[in-house]
Every structure is written in structure tokens, then in C-alpha cells.
């Protein structure tokens, strides 16, 4: 198994919606902006959002091939060092026919998500890279008035996602 390089301040991460597209819905899009701000300010990351990630529930559901395309493009982009999932859902299994395992294997990156994203973790396993079952953009990074301290601590210290940050 290939362990991707840890993230460091200034690294670019991609947000993908591999299952449910709710993060792009009018009533939830504000969580994207909260999460983006926290990922950039609290973790020092540069956030890019893949082209189809915020197109909403119906579009994302109807286009598994475009969800997979977003994932493949994120793996192909050498400037992207990590991929964080917007949220889980119920149908990421529909991406499987569109996955290129060699692309993933040849371009290892930090990959994190949970719930229905478990299917994508199996994809990473089949491609031979370590992935992380952890916080999603919509819930943990984009919820509440303040991110829970334990979420930040888990991401920074418990998961080996980040290189050492000044002793933290």
C-alpha cells in the first residue's frame, strides 16, 4: 500500500461530491463557504472545488460519470495534494464503471470521507493507496457556529494527514 504524502500549509485540496450532491443545493450551499473558509484559515490549505461538486442533488445523482470524472481529474492534477469528500450519500457505487485504478495508483493523494464514501475507500484500496475514513466537508467542516475542537484535533493530530506543524 502506498501512503500519500502528508499535507502541509499551502497545499491544494479538491472537494468532490462522489455520492449525494446536497452541498450544492440552495439550502445547504452556505455550509460549503463555511467549510472552505475553515479549511483555508484553520488548516492553511488552498481549496478548489471540482466542476460538478456543487451542481446540486439532482444533477449529481443523474451524472455518476461526471462525479467520477471530477475524482479522476483531481487525481491527475499534480497541484492537488488531497481530496476531501463533500458528504456521503447512497449511490457512489455507480461511479465504479468510470474509475481508472491506474490513475489513482500512479498519483497517490490524501483521500478523506465517510458514510457512502466507503465505496470510494474500497476504490483506493484496490488502487493500492491508503485512504482516511474521516470528516466530510459539509458536516464536520461546514457545520455549527464553531468547528468542534475534537474535529480539529483529530484531523491535525490523530489522522496522519498533515506534516508536523510547529510542534502540534
Predicted region positions:
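Gly/Ser/Thr-rich loops at beta-strand to alpha-helix junctions
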Residues: 20-23, 87-92, 112, 117-119
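Short glycine-/acidic-enriched loop or helix-start segments at secondary-structure transitions
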Residues: 25, 93-95, 122-123, 143
Amino acid at each position: 500500500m502506498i501512503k500519500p504524502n502528508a499535507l502541509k500549509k499551502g497545499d491544494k485540496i479538491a472537494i468532490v461530491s462522489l455520492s449525494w450532491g446536497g452541498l450544492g443545493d440552495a439550502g445547504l450551499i452556505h455550509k460549503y463557504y463555511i467549510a472552505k473558509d475553515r479549511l483555508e484559515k484553520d488548516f492553511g490549505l488552498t481549496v478548489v472545488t471540482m466542476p460538478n461538486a456543487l451542481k446540486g442533488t439532482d444533477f449529481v445523482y443523474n451524472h455518476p460519470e461526471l462525479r467520477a470524472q471530477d475524482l479522476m481529474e483531481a487525481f491527475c492534477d499534480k497541484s492537488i495534494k488531497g481530496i476531501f469528500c463533500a458528504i456521503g450519500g447512497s449511490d457512489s457505487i455507480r461511479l465504479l464503471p468510470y474509475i481508472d485504478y491506474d490513475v489513482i495508483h500512479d498519483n497517490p493523494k490524501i483521500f478523506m470521507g465517510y458514510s457512502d464514501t466507503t465505496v470510494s475507500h474500497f476504490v483506493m484500496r484496490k488502487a493500492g493507496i491508503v485512504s482516511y475514513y474521516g470528516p466530510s466537508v459539509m458536516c464536520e467542516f461546514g457545520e455549527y457556529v464553531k468547528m468542534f475542537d475534537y474535529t480539529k484535533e483529530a484531523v491535525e493530530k490523530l489522522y496522519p494527514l498533515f506534516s508536523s506543524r510547529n510542534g502540534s
